[in-house]
Amino acid sequence: MLRDIINLLKKDNLQAQALAECHEMLSMCEQMVAASVESLRRRDDATVDVDILTMDKKLNAFERDVRRKVMTHLSLGNTSDLTAGLVLISIVIDIERIGDYSKNIHDLATVHPDKLHGGSLEDDVAHVERDTLEILSRASKAFTEGDEELARELMAEYKDDISGRTRDMERALVAEGVITDSRQATALALYLRFLKRISAHARNLASSVVNPFDRIGYPE
């Protein structure tokens, strides 16, 4: 799978342009996630440093353009690029969804304008938050540079750390009621779910570096 993607970098065609757009989308997603987290967790007025809505619309336009370029390229008979084209169509969905979840976090900030604190779960919330930002950055690097070793590390870390820790906190919030303020508990539950989904889509991106097309999003 990695070889198919790397080969695109050596070409100048519609599919290579689609790959470049995926790289640009990833850069935008990193900015959007970081800014939305800052807005929710560290500001009392929900201000955000980038235009989340405009960037989200641009991501949507990029997604459509990637699909269109891949379809056009393959329809011209470039069957040797079929696998790479299928990969791009698959992962561009994950990239666009990361943008959607960053918008969800910002939307949460606007209805919860106070800084969102994790209460007794703060250390764990902060841990998942840091890991999510890091896994997104490293997944982007693994995909852009074709780093198989880094991709494998990220796939293992998501399952061992983010997924399990988030599940434990969700249980504490819902079953054990460790946060008694319903507004805070609801906001935390939503935030954790958004972070978990961002991490999962980043993991899918990493899996595209090492897995065949039919196993993207699954263990190697």
Question: What function would you assign to each model-found segment?
Answer:
Residues 1-220:
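Cytosolic, long alpha-helical scaffolding segments
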